[in-house]
């Protein structure tokens, strides 16, 4: 098993995992990393696209450059990795691509609009990809976590522009997100769901048990009005 990090000096020691330095934002870095794995193993059976960035801020407060940076990692990073790996999967006529999305990919929240937009893009890309590659014995699937006690949410950057009219609601949502992350389960449940998505029977979408599974079901089966009201109440905006 191989993992990738932008800085090998910061890679954790994990038994059975060999880390390779790579940056999903850099086409050359991605190609070099994938080719180094192929040289050692001759194949790649499973690709998990888990790199991601989050940002808190109103849509109006977010510059095009900030949005582009988020899309570069969250969406184009998946595209770069997928394009690098697919030729080898097609050659072996088998493989599984697991793209880590988010509940926000189906249930967008205020002040996380650009992040939600990237995850909606991941959802659409993954469904289209799955249709295209199944003829080669390859399937693409999505994992949709909710809040998880990791640094992604806790250390999410804020949009640099601040518009006074959004201050109150933005601060309320920021505190709500921080509280939810503090009380959220650790990453183990998400990791288990990723393993199931990678090696279990194929499903287009997999959500960890608990809040993530509940929220995706609410979005799917309840009318938009009650879901909207419930979301605003949860974030402290009602």
State what each model feature region is:
Residues 102:
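Residue(s) in the substrate-gating loop at a strand-loop-helix junction
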Residues 82, 118:
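Active-site helix of classical SDR
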Residues 25-40:
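Conserved Rossmann-fold cofactor-binding substructure of NAD(P)-dependent oxidoreductases
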Residues 58-59, 66-68:
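Substrate-binding pocket helix/loop in short-chain dehydrogenase/reductase
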Residues 132-181:
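C-terminal beta-strand-loop-alpha-helix "lid" module of Rossmann-like NAD(P)-dependent dehydrogenases
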Residues 36-49, 55:
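A glycine-rich helix->loop->beta "capping" turn
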Residues 15-28:
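Rossmann-fold cofactor-recognition segment
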